[in-house]
Amino acid sequence: MPDSRPDTELSNPQSAKAPLDPHLKALENESIHIFREVAAEFERPVMLYSIGKDSSVLLHLARKAFYPGRVPFPLLHVNTGWKFSEMIAFRDETAKKYDLDLIEHINPRGKAENITPFTHGSAAFTDIMKTEGLRQALDAGQFDAAFGGARRDEEASRAKERIYSFRTPDHRWDPRNQRPELWNIYNGMIRKGESVRAFPLSNWTEVDIWRYIQAEDIPLVPLYYAKKRPFVERDGMMILAEDPRLELLPGEVRQEGMIRFRTLGDFPLTGAIRSQATTLEEVIAELEIATVSERQGRAIDRDQSGSMEKKKREGYF
């Protein structure tokens, strides 16, 4: 096993930077405490890695929590086969740069049956390729705790979820059966077969995430920054038109414009926004006056009534 301890300032998450402001420092301390608590309480933790900005912050915090050692648990990417190509390139580069144990899982049933967002719709596609795929991967790895990057400010069902989110043996979540969390005391006692989803970023906001990225100089997928890109307008969203699998529907026209993404997922189900924000400073300034949630750009959040809570009850991220 090669020595994975960072030997450059660039790869050292603890390297000298300007001190964090008290608000961000408090959030960072809480997140690091949660990482260490879960690592100490559970036998087989794993970190869910979706390659987006929250995952990048989550990974940075995990590296800080256990520096100068390696991140002591694997990263799990549930791949649907429909991610932006820039996301996959960034994932592979990151795993190599930080010597991470990266597990990639694609639902074999979904792959064999050629389940796609175009042929089966967003609800069925997400259920099979994401929720079912995640349950398969967690069972295969016998993981009893999974770190996720969800934040309470994102969406209503996430707002009421605890930092330790307890799951049944079939990974289901019951929002009416959550344990109290007093201060920073977390009860990790589980029965055989049960598991926990742990959310170190629960109390962060989207602006907190971006300010922390700026303060800590955390690299991101370039899609978060505005650039002239091709797109088509479909179902009220601007869909990136770079993948040859995207076929134009009758009446659709391929356009070009300055766009970026506030959230990243599968490219056919993730809408861009018009933006001129090409730098971190410009992105933060744009977010400070935003009036809608970043999740407005996700088709899976509005494909049926109570969509996100229903998905989470069934085992979604």
UniProtKB/Swiss-Prot annotation:
InterPro entries membership: PAPS_reduct_dom, Rossmann-like_a/b/a_fold, SO4_adenylTrfase_ssu, Sulfate_adenylyltrnsfr_sub2
Keyword Metal-binding among record annotations: no
Domain of life: Bacteria
GO molecular function ontology, one term from the record: ATP binding
Position of the signal peptide: none
Pathway: Sulfur metabolism; hydrogen sulfide biosynthesis; sulfite from sulfate: step 1/3
Chain positions covered by the region annotation Disordered: 1-21, 298-317
Enzymatic reactions: sulfate + ATP + H(+) = adenosine 5'-phosphosulfate + diphosphate
Enzyme superclass (EC): transferase
Purpose: With CysN forms the ATP sulfurylase (ATPS) that catalyzes the adenylation of sulfate producing adenosine 5'-phosphosulfate (APS) and diphosphate, the first enzymatic step in sulfur assimilation pathway. APS synthesis involves the formation of a high-energy phosphoric-sulfuric acid anhydride bond driven by GTP hydrolysis by CysN coupled to ATP hydrolysis by CysD.
Xref: HAMAP family: Sulf_adenylyltr_sub2
Oligomeric form and interacting partners: Heterodimer composed of CysD, the smaller subunit, and CysN.
Family the UniProt entry places it in: Belongs to the PAPS reductase family. CysD subfamily.
The protein's name: Sulfate adenylyltransferase subunit 2
Gene encoding the protein: cysD
